[in-house]
Amino acid sequence: MTHTLHLVIHGRVQGVGYRAWCADEAVSRGLSGFVRNRREGTVEAVISGPSEAVAAMLEACRSGPAHAHVERIEEALAEAPPAGTGFRVAATV
């Protein structure tokens, strides 16, 4: 069963390689979606795939890469991205 989450990650998550780390983690788990910086200092992501892989990715996002410090993650259900789109780092909004 496919599960899709919209995440907003708060904390020290910009300038620490969070987006590249997130994309690598998502691709290694076979997920689709995107990750991007937001001008107010958070990182936004949509992750979609098998429920177990999405749950594991969410747990990984709570820690992030070595220099990140995640304070909290807002999560909400979201619509799945179009099939076959893969996972990408998107432009800042």
From Swiss-Prot:
Keywords: Hydrolase. Belongs to the acylphosphatase family. Residues 4-91 form the Acylphosphatase-like domain. Pfam families: Acylphosphatase. It comes from the Bacteria. This is Acylphosphatase. It comes from Azorhizobium caulinodans (strain ATCC 43989 / DSM 5975 / JCM 20966 / LMG 6465 / NBRC 14845 / NCIMB 13405 / ORS 571). GO terms for molecular function: acylphosphatase activity. The active site is at residues 19, 37. It catalyses: an acyl phosphate + H2O = a carboxylate + phosphate + H(+). Its EC number is 3.6.1.7.
